[in-house]
Amino acid sequence: MKWLKQLQSLHTKLVIVYVLLIIIGMQIIGLYFTNNLEKELLDNFKKNITQYAKQLEISIEKVYDEKGSVNAQKDIQNLLSEYANRQEIGEIRFIDKDQIIIATTKQSNRSLINQKANDSSVQKALSLGQSNDHLILKDYGGGKDRVWVYNIPVKVDKKVIGNIYIESKINDVYNQLNNINQIFIVGTAISLLITVILGFFIARTITKPITDMRNQTVEMSRGNYTQRVKIYGNDEIGELALAFNNLSKRVQEAQANTESEKRRLDSVITHMSDGIIATDRRGRIRIVNDMALKMLGMAKEDIIGYYMLSVLSLEDEFKLEEIQENNDSFLLDLNEEEGLIARVNFSTIVQETGFVTGYIAVLHDVTEQQQVERERREFVANVSHELRTPLTSMNSYIEALEEGAWKDEELAPQFLSVTREETERMIRLVNDLLQLSKMDNESDQINKEIIDFNMFINKIINRHEMSTKDTTFIRDIPKKTIFTEFDPDKMTQVFDNVITNAMKYSRGDKRVEFHVKQNPLYNRMTIRIKDNGIGIPINKVDKIFDRFYRVDKARTRKMGGTGLGLAISKEIVEAHNGRIWANSVEGQGTSIFITLPCEVIEDGDWDE
């Protein structure tokens, strides 16, 4: 029904009336023009053929005067052929007074020469001695054409001696008329199109002010006061439009102030680093920013309209009345999956009359702070524990020595030996802690050198092989020299830590394997150090590089470990743009993998 409504509009009605007037005018002009043009073209065509025929008549009369009727046939044939070279001429015949065809220009009709013509128009021209014409349809091989037949009698000494019969194709005239009509139709169509377009614009100048005021009225009813009605004149409609604009402007200014404050508040809430939740006076959530949604791990549609205390899982601990009385902050686990902890502060929205209209909860993410605090406490506890154990042991032995054990020649050396071992263990622990502290503060310098890795790793293996007799070392190292760039002292510490652990935890026929594999495509090499020890449970493999972590604390402490060796090794390897990780099968052994950058340098390359 929308099109019907549009059709009934004042704008459309004006355009339709305007177009109909143009169509009627163009039809009248076109009819008058085509009729007169057709008459003019036909008259010109017939006039040309008539003049042409008269020239031919004069020529034939001369032939008859000179040669007579008996010897004139050949010359008349030549005359007809000469005059028949015009495009519009279909055929010319000369027929004598006895209606015998003397000559013809059409080759296919040469057989009709010396035969009698039975055309009634020819008989009429010969009998009356007057020219005549008529239209016929005739096929010249390309389809039927309109043909204008013209007969003109030839007189010598005022006696009719014959008749000139001319068939002229008049199709070109009608084709020309059709072309002109087509041009006129196209011109009319273009004129109508332009008329419609102009009609819309012209009608628009009349209906636009009324339409604008109608639309403005609708928009104002919807609360939109931004539009303005264009004033086209100083008449009554223009005055009405001016009144509309003044009304819209005043209301818009008041609304703009409100919207500006609202947008400013929304922008602040949206871009805050803290989560914001605002509720109505009943505690139902009405506003929540993106940060709060991220902290809660919820979508906006899953939280709007729900009770704030229920969303924060506090309905059993707090009531809305308590929030008004107590503004203290507290910690809250918001997202257990991500371990997110937030400090929550509540406040109330109160009118000047004291009426509470809503509540606001501010969520501040303190997860990182809590994590740092927890790690600090764990570190202090671990260091305290690691120092307390040897100190307690040393204190016990020193007390025993003070009580007289130093006199016992067997016990005194043992007590002193244990005290020395515990002292050395504490020194190692303190040194490891100092090194870790330097790495954390990035104050531990790394002095890189280009190293022949084959020679480097073999030297370390040889040293450990000479220091023990109960462990077999198996080497799978490429013969081709691999060069790398690292701090030899730091990497020696890494390999010593890994090899020492492999030797400590191997059992039975102790065996430590070394496998070195190079990937030239990525300029990386992988070192695998495998033992046949007790192995590590699969759920604890990733934790062995944590500080102070021990799979078996009693066994590790008994063997003199501090729990920091692999943690230091990881820091050193990563500082060399490398990676270290472990694979283990419990009861079968553990493999430590180390990847480092490397280069394959041919012997001749050093000479460049």
From Swiss-Prot:
HAMP domain span: 204-256
Catalyzed reactions: ATP + protein L-histidine = ADP + protein N-phospho-L-histidine
Post-translational modification summary for this protein: Autophosphorylated.
SUPFAM superfamilies in the record: ATPase domain of HSP90 chaperone/DNA topoisomerase II/histidine kinase, HAMP domain-like, Homodimeric domain of signal transducing histidine kinase, PYP-like sensor domain (PAS domain), Sensory domain-like
SMART domains: HAMP, HATPase_c, HisKA, PAS
Class of the enzyme per the UniProt entry, highest EC level: transferase
Modulation of this protein's activity: By zinc. Zinc-binding negatively regulates WalK kinase activity and thus autophosphorylation.
Domain PAS: 261-331
Residue numbers binding Zn(2+): 271, 274, 364, 368
Subcellular localization: Cell membrane
Domain of life: Bacteria
Protein function: Member of the two-component regulatory system WalK/WalR that regulates genes involved in cell wall metabolism, virulence regulation, biofilm production, oxidative stress resistance and antibiotic resistance via direct or indirect regulation of autolysins. Functions as a sensor protein kinase which is autophosphorylated at a histidine residue in the dimerization domain and transfers its phosphate group to the conserved aspartic acid residue in the regulatory domain of WalR.
Subunit (UniProt): Forms homodimers. Forms homooligomers.
Protein name as catalogued: Sensor protein kinase WalK
